[in-house]
């Protein structure tokens, strides 16, 4: 008897290779390794808690790129400290140099102050000397002006007095000339008039004989004698004009002296 032996089944053909390979990686498994031990209905979020989402990762990387590393921060701090110290040193150096300059300037000013003070004193003394010379010159010119004015005043006064004296003197001379030229007439009649006339002549001759020789020989008395008149050496008008002239001259001299003392 023959037994029906089963024929071996033919194996299926191998699958064809894919035409293109996917470039994106496969998504991570939703469940971790602990799912094998956990029941199927119990889900675990440990994977999500352990690895943050991609947006959070990108934000953290950007923040880290923005914040400098610790070494860079330390170098920046050291650089800032060095620059502040350099600025302080520069400021102290500039302040010390300014103080030294001030000291040098004060020393120079102290050294040059006696020289300038001497110059100022000499300049002031020169100015005072010039002012004194100007004042003396002004006083001198003022005195000269006063002297000139006094001289002019005196000259005008003398001219006025001489003119008045000449007028009065001319009138007196004219009167004397008229009396000298006038003929002597005897208005009396009879022997009594003749006797009186003779008595007068005798008295007149007696006065002349008793006078000194200088008076008799003077040119004033050598002229014609008027009848019944008296001998006059100087008239009252001449004496008054001479006194006025003398008083005016004395007043002018006193005024000149006073003006000269005031000018000095």
From Swiss-Prot:
Ranges of Pro residues composition bias in the record: 9-30
Disulfide bonds: none
GO CC, one annotated term: plasma membrane
Keyword DNA-binding tagged: no
A molecular-function term among this protein's GO annotations: kinase inhibitor activity
Domain of life: Eukaryota
Biased composition annotated in UniProt, kind: Polar residues: 77-97
Listed GO biological process terms: brassinosteroid mediated signaling pathway; lipid metabolic process
Compositionally biased intervals (Basic and acidic residues): 98-107
Post-translational modification: Phosphorylated by BRI1.
Region Disordered: start-end pairs: 1-146, 165-240
Annotated function: Negative regulator of brassinosteroid signaling.
Protein's name in the database: Probable BRI1 kinase inhibitor 1
Source organism of the structure: Oryza sativa subsp. japonica (Rice)
């Amino acid at each position: 008897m023959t037994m029906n032996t089963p024929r071996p089944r033919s194996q299926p053909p191998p699958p064809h290779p894919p035409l293109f390979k996917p470039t994106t990686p496969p998504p991570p498994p939703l469940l971790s390794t602990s799912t094998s031990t956990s029941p199927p209905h119990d889900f675990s979020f440990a994977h999500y808690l352990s690895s943050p989402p991609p947006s959070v990762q990108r934000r953290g990387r950007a923040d880290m790129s923005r914040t400098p590393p610790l070494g860079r921060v330390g170098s920046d701090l050291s650089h800032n400290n060095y620059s502040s110290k350099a600025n302080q040193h520069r400021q102290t150096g500039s302040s010390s140099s300014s103080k030294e300059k001030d000291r040098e300037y004060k020393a120079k000013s102290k050294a040059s102050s006696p020289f300038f003070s001497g110059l100022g004193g000499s300049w002031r003394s020169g100015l005072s000397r010039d002012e004194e010379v100007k004042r003396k010159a002004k006083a001198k010119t003022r005195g000269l002006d006063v002297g000139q004015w006094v001289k002019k005043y005196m000259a005008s006064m003398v001219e006025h007095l001489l003119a008045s004296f000449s007028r009065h003197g001319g009138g007196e001379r004219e009167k004397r000339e008229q009396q000298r030229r006038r003929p002597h007439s005897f208005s009396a009649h009879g022997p009594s008039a003749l006797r009186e006339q003779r008595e007068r002549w005798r008295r007149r001759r007696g006065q002349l004989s008793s006078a000194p020789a200088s008076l008799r020989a003077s040119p004033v008395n050598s002229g014609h004698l008027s009848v019944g008149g008296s001998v006059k050496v100087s008239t009252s008008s001449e004496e008054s004009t001479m006194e006025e002239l003398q008083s005016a001259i004395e007043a002018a001299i006193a005024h000149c002296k006073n003006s000269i003392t005031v000018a000095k």
